[in-house]
């Protein structure tokens, strides 16, 4: 059987049609992977909702309560950038459960991919940039607490710095945060990851991949992680509305293949999330996200 893929219909919930967050992409990605034969139905696992205690390994209890009950201040809700509804709460919790399950499956099978996740702008006490709960951080702490893995490497290649994740783990020697992002982009105030690589605007495939290849192997041998989380944001694409870099589909596929094959060849299990992407055409965007799963199929 192929590598495990995590999906739940609750990854999608209605929000206003004109909203720039591409909510339908999760359902469309799952559909495209099946339609193109990248995955088979028996590879798909469905997550459960996470325990409240797991959320509170990262987030302040008052924040979790206020968000789930819809009692955040208007300012705090605006900072998140998504409208509040019971459906968005369910979607948020389900995606966190999905990343936790993806991590478990990666430890069992060597590689697993979520069809959502990567909410790296969420801080312990507030959400930001379409990110409400930090799934990467919650999954990391949950996996550690359950004794499944201790040393964690987070490879964040979304075009925006993983500021929430960096902040959460800034004093934690068991978690190494690596963010490679466009320097002149959201968030304007960066946090300090264990390794930050701020890239110039307009960087193309070859320039990008050269920098990544130069650092990745050394990083793995330095950190020696029990588990790698990989945030494969596709907003590095030249056609992305919020990206400012100049990667192509070919470059994205080469990137995914480089990360996965380097980790697997060295014997490190990888749990993947899809991260950000903001193309005008949602079908173009969904195809870009599918390159992660296509690369996973090809290296597994």
UniProtKB/Swiss-Prot annotation:
PANTHER family membership: HISTONE DEACETYLASE 12, HISTONE DEACETYLASE HDAC1-RELATED
Protein keywords: Hydrolase
Protein's name according to its UniProt entry: Uncharacterized protein SYNPCC7002_A1628
MF terms in GO: histone deacetylase activity; hydrolase activity
Positions of disulphide bridges: none
Organism for this UniProt entry: Picosynechococcus sp. (strain ATCC 27264 / PCC 7002 / PR-6) (Agmenellum quadruplicatum)
Pfam families in alphabetical order: Hist_deacetyl (PF00850)
InterPro entries (UniProt xref): HDAC_classIV, HDAC_PDAC, His_deacetylse, His_deacetylse_dom, His_deacetylse_dom_sf, Ureohydrolase_dom_sf
Family: Belongs to the histone deacetylase family.
GO biological process, one term: epigenetic regulation of gene expression
Function according to Swiss-Prot or TrEMBL: Putative deacetylase.
Tagged with keyword Membrane: no
Superkingdom: Bacteria
């Amino acid at each position: 059987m192929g590598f495990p893929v995590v999906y739940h219909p609750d990854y999608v919930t209605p929000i206003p049609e004109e909203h720039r967050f591409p909510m339908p992409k999760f359902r469309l990605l799952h559909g495209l992977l099946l339609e193109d034969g990248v995955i088979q139905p028996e590879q798909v696992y469905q997550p459960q909702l996470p325990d409240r205690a797991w959320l509170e390994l990262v987030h302040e209890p008052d924040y979790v309560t206020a968000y789930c009950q819809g009692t955040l201040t208007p300012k705090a809700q605006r900072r998140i950038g998504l409208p509040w509804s019971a459906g968005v709460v369910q979607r948020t919790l389900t995606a966190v459960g999905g990343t936790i399950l993806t991590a478990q499956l990666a430890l069992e099978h060597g590689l697993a991919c979520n069809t959502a996740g990567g909410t790296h702008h969420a801080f312990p006490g507030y959400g930001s940039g379409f990110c409400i709960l930090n799934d990467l951080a919650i999954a990391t702490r949950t996996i550690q607490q359950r004794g499944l893995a201790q040393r964690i490497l987070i490879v964040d290649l979304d075009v925006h710095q993983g500021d929430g994740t960096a902040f959460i783990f800034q004093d934690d020697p068991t978690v190494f945060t690596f963010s490679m992002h466009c320097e002149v982009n959201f968030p304007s105030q960066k946090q300090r990851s264990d390794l930050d690589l701020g890239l110039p605007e307009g960087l193309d495939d070859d320039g990008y991949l050269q920098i990544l290849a130069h650092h990745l192997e050394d990083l793995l041998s330095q950190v020696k992680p029990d588990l790698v989380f990989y945030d494969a944001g596709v907003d590095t694409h030249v056609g992305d509305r919020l990206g400012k870099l100049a990667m192509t589909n070919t470059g994205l596929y080469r990137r995914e293949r480089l990360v996965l094959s380097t980790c697997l060849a060295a014997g490190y299990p990888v749990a993947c999330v899809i991260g950000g992407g903001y193309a005008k055409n949602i079908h173009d965007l969904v195809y870009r996200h599918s390159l992660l799963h296509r690369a996973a199929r090809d290296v597994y």
